[in-house]
Swiss-Prot record:
Protein name from the UniProt record: Chaperone protein SicA
SUPFAM superfamilies linked to this entry: TPR-like
GO CC annotations on file: cytoplasm
Protein origin, superkingdom: Bacteria
Pfam families: TPR_3 (PF07720)
Places the protein is found: Cytoplasm
Subunit composition and interactions: Dimer or higher-order oligomers.
This protein's UniProt keywords: Activator, Chaperone, Cytoplasm, Transcription, Transcription regulation, Virulence
Organism: Salmonella typhimurium (strain LT2 / SGSC1412 / ATCC 700720)
Described function: Type III secretion-associated chaperone required for SipB and SipC stabilization. Prevents premature association of SipB with SipC, which may lead to their targeting for degradation. Along with InvF, required for transcription activation of sigDE (sopB pipC), sicAsipBCDA, and sopE.
GO molecular function: identical protein binding
Length: 165
């Protein structure tokens, strides 16, 4: 009997792998309805807003695993990582979200913030410049310009200090 269970488990695993390889999500494979995913997202978002980051991370991680094509889930997990000061992980997740979102430059903007917090001003500048040049979201462009201006001011002050020495 154990041999049959083992064979059937292997076959199920193989079928799941085949489905995922062809673009299906685990949500689809397991037949999880979208309204359940939406409910889980609502809980994750609520935990995030309450500052309960460990709980939010657990929910967003589950959502990402079960539907890796939904950029909202990836953005949520990235935002949690950013608040937990896991900046490189947040940058990696924002990169995934950007590939899913195509012309939405919010992930690039948030990556710029993370780069600044990792003290990588040149990379941060590249992110904010890209947002400034390419986004159609005027509000996001304005925020990027504020960061670019602050970086410029900081550079000017740094050069002034170096000249005094």
């Amino acid at each position: 009997m154990d041999y049959q269970n083992n064979v059937s488990e292997e076959r199920v695993a193989e079928m799941i792998w085949d489905a995922v390889s062809e673009g299906a999500t685990l949500k689809d494979v397991h037949g999880i309805p979208q309204d359940m995913m939406d409910g889980l997202y609502a809980h994750a978002y609520e935990f995030y807003n309450q500052g309960r980051l460990d709980e939010a991370e657990t929910f967003f991680r589950f959502l990402c695993i079960y539907d890796f094509y939904n950029p909202d889930y990836t953005m949520g997990l990235a935002a949690v990582c950013q608040l937990k000061k896991q900046f490189q992980k947040a940058c990696d997740l924002y990169a995934v979200a950007f590939t899913l979102l195509k012309n939405d430059y919010r992930p690039v903007f948030f990556t710029g913030q993370c780069q600044l917090l990792m003290r990588k001003a040149a990379k941060a500048r590249q992110c904010f410049e890209l947002v400034n040049e390419r986004t159609e979201d005027e509000s996001l462009r304005a925020k990027a310009l504020v960061y670019l201006e602050a970086l410029k001011t900081a550079e000017t002050e740094q050069h002034s200090e170096q000249e005094k020495e």
